[in-house]
Amino acid sequence: MADTIKKNLNKPDETRTFPKGKIEVVKIGDLTFGKATFEPGWKWSECLKSIVGTKSCMVNHNGYVVSGRMHIKMDAGSEIDIGPGDVFVCPPGHDAWIVGSEPCVAYDFTGAETYAKKA
């Protein structure tokens, strides 16, 4: 029988910083869980494109927004805003940016393993 495992995001296994943001990552078994913080003025295509090396974000995100607002634009053209309390699924092939003057904090249940890493 397996034991219960606990980790705390206040003591992440890894913190990846990038212009105007960071992602704090904990790994538990096969799960990689992230808490991402994006400052006002953050935009994926301006802050992470050169780090990752792809034309748009190719990470799949399943997440929950704690605070702030983010606008997501898919490569195919559809757009959506997400904010506090929203649970979202965002497939690969998108740009995103912060809306307003409040930092956006979101938990990512699927994309933290590779987010903000060179493709």
Q: Residue spans of the language-model regions?
A:
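A short, N-terminal "cap"/entry segment at the start of jelly-roll beta-barrel domains
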Residues: 1-37, 45
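Glycine- and acidic-residue-biased ligand/ion/polar-headgroup-sensing regions
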Residues: 31, 50-76
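Short beta-strand segments
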Residues: 34, 78-80, 105
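Conserved short histidine dyad/triad with adjacent acidic residue
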Residues: 35-56
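Conserved GNAT-family N-acetyltransferase fold
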Residues: 36-38, 63, 88
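Short beta-strand segments in beta-sandwich/barrel cores
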Residues: 43-44, 68-73, 96
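Short acidic-glycine-tyrosine-enriched beta hairpin
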Residues: 74-93
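Ligand-binding loop in jelly-roll beta-barrel domains
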Residues: 91-117
